[in-house]
């Protein structure tokens, strides 16, 4: 079972817990030169909070927290910025959750006066802030198991399902490679979705991949004794042509024969973050019953050097027949994605193909550790992602699909039709243009999540609802769910 870490349970409470041993989290908002507090607080507590603000012990800045003794219990303030600032609310409640996760088994969220959207994001922030991956530790610190919600109008089922999907993606992305090689990942996904009557999981074995000509997936995985798999999750939530989500799952990426430098190589356990996000999004879509037909494809491989590894100058026949000349074995993600993308477009009849991949270091150089690069020629799809980004706080930036650059995929090829790695500059664009060749005219979006997917050196820039210590944050699950929901409603 992959879902090692479960979010705290959510329940509605009909009364406040002031004066009990259970801490109460209270949002604090900016209002001019003062603060705005939620309605219905006891007068003495309101006075305490205002006095604490005047003494600078309490701040409304997003993500700031303070712990105040009150009536023998504990109040935790959550700085949320201006009223209506969804990111501020997420940060505030996530930071507050971090303050109690290791000390209390339960906490109460005071959401009086918050609308449905804000109160839902507050709950999501608190759930995500409580994440701890402790499966591989002998001593576990997390105590928090229950969140009580008082007031507001949060969509608790939605918040719980989203948090489960993000936790699942985090667990997969951060799992040590020996614990989740391709075959075990495939088996875990089969087990995970077996509880749904409207979800089918099909796993292509190495022999089947070889027999059916998935040259990209097979070649990248040849160097490892743990052979590759293609995991296909089919969710029957609605009629019509399916939407395909394709996620890169390189369980560990050493670079292959073009070996990476040792510095930072341990982060390459998270080179499966795109595939992890697709698994998490498929889980959440099924839990929520999104009214759409959705297919998740996760090509899973290990890219390591050995006597049987694929080599620079090899020419690979891809599933759709394209002949690709290998110029860099560390540009492996696009090879496994291309096979899955073309299969989704041509064999599975997808109307739209969306892929997520920790694809290039170039996108991290361009956009830093918090922002994913969005590549699409569809203005409608771009709008859906941009609106979803504003709602979820998962940052994106639309990047160009420059046709002139596409020449660099073909001109250097000596034996093949195209190369897998073109010139040095504009690497993120070349990666997107390479993948676009395999969608066969279908609507397409490529998300290069190398920055936020792995959280490269995010440090103090990371929001408090990301895991601590630079772990992969499960980026993309919330973004995908919002986009899929909009598409199901006809808004994407």
Swiss-Prot record:
Annotated Mn(2+) 1 binding sites: 253, 330, 332
Active site, per annotation: 260, 334
Protein residues bound to Mn(2+) 2: 248, 253, 271, 332
GO annotation, cellular component aspect: cytoplasm
UniProt enzyme class: hydrolase
Localization annotation: Cytoplasm
Required cofactor(s): Mn(2+)
Any one GO MF annotation of this record: metalloaminopeptidase activity
GO biological process, one term: proteolysis
Cofactor note as given: Binds 2 manganese ions per subunit.
Keywords in alphabetical order: Aminopeptidase, Cytoplasm, Hydrolase, Manganese, Metal-binding, Protease
Chief place of localization: cytoplasm
Keyword Ribonucleoprotein: no
Catalytic activity: Release of an N-terminal amino acid, Xaa-|-Yaa-, in which Xaa is preferably Leu, but may be other amino acids including Pro although not Arg or Lys, and Yaa may be Pro. Amino acid amides and methyl esters are also readily hydrolyzed, but rates on arylamides are exceedingly low; Release of an N-terminal amino acid, preferentially leucine, but not glutamic or aspartic acids
Enzyme Commission identifier(s): 3.4.11.1, 3.4.11.10
The keyword Transcription regulation is assigned to this record: no
Homology family: Belongs to the peptidase M17 family.
Matches recorded under HAMAP family: Cytosol_peptidase_M17
Function according to Swiss-Prot or TrEMBL: Presumably involved in the processing and regular turnover of intracellular proteins. Catalyzes the removal of unsubstituted N-terminal amino acids from various peptides.
Listed name of the protein: Probable cytosol aminopeptidase
Encoding gene (name): pepA
